[in-house]
């Protein structure tokens, strides 16, 4: 990887099981990563850390966010595809050029729209767990499927990512 002065780095965090390893691996130098690039996360990730940008697509998650005791959505940028997003918090905005993709794909697309040309995708697993359990670190918590309810059509994730990568239209390197 070659970075230069024109490189604008983003880290886009998904909620797949692989993120558990990444969380442990990066925990000792999270502060350094904050200085290197902008951090985008999805849905319930706000429960664990403050991000530069949070993308929330599900209305139940938006309702949870609006009731958060720390008022996350009134203090930090939150993005969604729904009209009138201010009902969920003063910092909630519409995603420009929203394509109604899943939260992970929408977060990566938002990073590209914000001018990032080097994007690291972390925890975007795009497939079910080998054991058949739900592939999400927030499974069995509020607004998430139970551990045995993996009825997600993963082909849709592939389609969303393919559309997003086409829309990014070159000039962006994804890792």
What are these regions (language model features)?
Residues 1-175:
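Metal-ion/cofactor- or nucleotide/acyl-coenzyme-handling active-site neighborhoods
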């Amino acid at each position: 990887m070659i970075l230069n002065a024109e490189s604008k780095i983003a880290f886009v965090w998904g909620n797949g099981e692989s993120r558990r390893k990444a969380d442990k691996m990066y925990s000792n130098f999270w502060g350094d990563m904050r200085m290197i690039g902008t951090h985008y996360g999805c849905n319930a990730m706000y429960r664990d850390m403050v991000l530069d940008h949070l993308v929330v697509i599900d209305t139940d998650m938006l309702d949870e966010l609006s009731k958060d005791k720390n008022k996350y959505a009134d203090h930090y940028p939150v993005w969604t595809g729904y009209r009138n997003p201010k009902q969920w918090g003063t910092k909630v905005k519409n995603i420009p050029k929203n394509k109604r993709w899943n939260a992970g794909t929408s977060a990566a697309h938002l990073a590209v729209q914000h001018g990032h040309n080097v994007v690291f995708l972390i925890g975007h697993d795009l497939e079910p767990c080998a054991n058949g359990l739900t592939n999400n670190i927030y499974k069995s918590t509020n607004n998430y499927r139970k551990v045995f309810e993996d009825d997600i059509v993963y082909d849709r994730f592939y389609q969303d990512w393919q559309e997003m990568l086409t829309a990014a239209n070159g000039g962006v390197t994804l890792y």
